[in-house]
Regions:
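Single conserved hydrophobic/aromatic residue that forms the stacking wall/gate
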Residues: 1-7, 12
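Aromatic- and glycine-enriched glycan-recognition loops and surfaces
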Residues: 8, 16-47, 245-247, 295
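Aromatic- and acidic-residue-enriched segments that line the glycan-binding/catalytic groove
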Residues: 13-19, 54-93, 179-189, 280-284
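The substrate-binding groove and active-site-proximal loops of carbohydrate-active enzymes
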Residues: 15-30, 101-116, 133-142, 197, ...
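Carbohydrate-interacting/catalytic domains
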Residues: 40, 180, 204, 249, ...
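Core domains of carbohydrate- and sulfate-ester-processing enzymes
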Residues: 44, 62-105, 193-216
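Hydrophobic faces of well-ordered beta-strands that scaffold small-molecule active sites
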Residues: 48-50, 135, 164-166, 229, ...
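Active-site-proximal helices and loops of the catalytic beta/alpha 8
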Residues: 128, 138-221, 255, 274-303, ...
Length: 389
């Protein structure tokens, strides 16, 4: 479970304008409350990943407040990117760099050892106080690489299985997902391919992205890496709103839970919650639910998740495209001890696929039905099949 709770106190930007890294947002509870929640989650086998916002802080952050008060005399002036010959949009008497032009978010100087020392001490306290299991690094594409290397080494010593997952949009994920920096990052390439393939009825797009990333050819770029995969999140329009055809919701999740990566579900989307990203805010994406609203989609997702958890091939297997059509896709996930075909049909029409690798006796895991293939596989309309051989 990934949570963004720490450091905001009465923030104005969805808890990304940190004021105090060592205090839980008071609107949600106390540090003791969160410690109790973490303990309860751990008792149920759930690990906790906190949102680590280390690129910037809010204007209310104590060190920035000290700079506002003392200007040149502040010992924290080198914690930020400042110019005392200019002025800010807030008439502070000095200019400072804000994250991507957002001046309510003051960019930290992560190349300053004092800043990185402070942040690492905060992470240490989170681990000691809450026993968290990992961090999702906000805007990891903007973070100093030396800082991420130091963070990886530091966390490894404190808690060997501690996970570091970065928010990265596009570009080469290998730059920060490697043995020295992060364990994983967000796979926005496949996020985009997932919904646009279905909206355009062109499954060649997602098939190309998956092969480009995880295929067996020497030029495939992320083989062996476990990227964080998703159909929606707190920054993008929800799946149920962006898909043109509601019948494709199950198809999208069938691909997501069958493809390589670490699948992540956004709260509420497990029952098909809708939400459109607005040009100037994300409020519609982050509603408060008084209670869960489970339905048939929820039950179906729970079933797919259970199947994935029990399958070495779905979790760790190689990837290979078998059949690619505009409306249909069949790909293989394979380890030394298990072979699974993931077959989807996004069309309202039944389709029969023919291929030499569609052979053998196996089990369709979703329905628990035995079947024998002799070079052909019939796909019902709007269907997902996981066939184990």
């Amino acid at each position: 479970i990934s949570l963004g709770l720490v450091g905001s106190e009465m923030c104005i930007r969805d808890r990304y304008d940190t004021r105090n890294f060592l205090k839980i947002d008071c609107r949600l509870g106390t540090n003791k409350d969160f410690s109790d929640v973490c303990s309860h989650l751990h008792q149920h086998g759930i690990r906790i990943v906190l949102d680590g916002v280390f690129n910037h802080v809010g204007r209310g952050f104590w060190a920035f407040q000290d700079v506002k008060e003392k200007k040149w005399g502040s010992p924290y002036k080198d914690w930020f990117y400042l110019n005392f010959d200019g002025d800010s949009a807030y008439q502070d008497g000095f200019w400072y760099e804000g994250w991507e032009g957002h001046f309510e978010l003051v960019k930290l100087n992560l190349q300053n050892p004092a800043v990185s020392d402070y942040l690492l001490e905060c992470v240490k306290q989170w681990i000691e106080q809450f026993d968290i299991d990992g961090l999702r690094l906000d805007v990891a594409y903007s973070l100093d690489h030396s800082f991420m290397r130091r963070l990886r080494s530091f966390c490894q010593e404190l808690k060997p299985n501690f996970a570091l997952i970065g928010e990265v949009l596009f570009g080469d994920y290998n730059l920060i997902v490697n043995d020295d920096m992060l364990h994983s990052c967000t796979n926005y390439e496949c996020y985009k391919g997932l919904f646009s393939s279905l909206n355009d009825m062109n499954l060649f797009e997602i098939a190309h992205s998956l092969h480009r990333q995880f295929g067996a050819d020497p030029w495939c770029i992320y083989r062996g890496k476990h990227l964080m995969t998703f159909a929606d999140n707190h920054d993008v329009t929800r799946l149920a709103s962006i898909l043109k055809n509601k019948q494709h919701i199950r198809i999208a999740y069938g691909i997501l839970l069958g493809m390589p990566g670490i699948p992540c579900l956004y709260y509420g989307s497990e029952w098909g919650e809708e939400g459109m990203k607005a040009p100037d805010n994300d409020y519609a994406l982050r509603p408060c639910f008084e209670e869960p609203k489970p339905n048939e989609l929820t039950d179906w997702l729970c079933h797919l998740i259970s199947l994935r958890q029990k399958s070495d091939a779905l979790c760790n297997g190689d990837y290979r495209n078998i059949v690619i059509q505009n409306h249909q896709l069949i790909f293989e996930r394979k380890t030394d001890n298990e072979r699974i075909l993931v077959a989807v049909n996004a069309s309202e029409q039944e389709y029969t696929a023919y291929h030499g690798d569609l052979n053998g006796t196996g089990t369709e895991l979703i329905t628990d039905a035995e079947l024998t293939l002799n070079g052909a596989l019939t796909l019902p309309p709007y269907s997902v099949q996981y066939i184990r051989f």
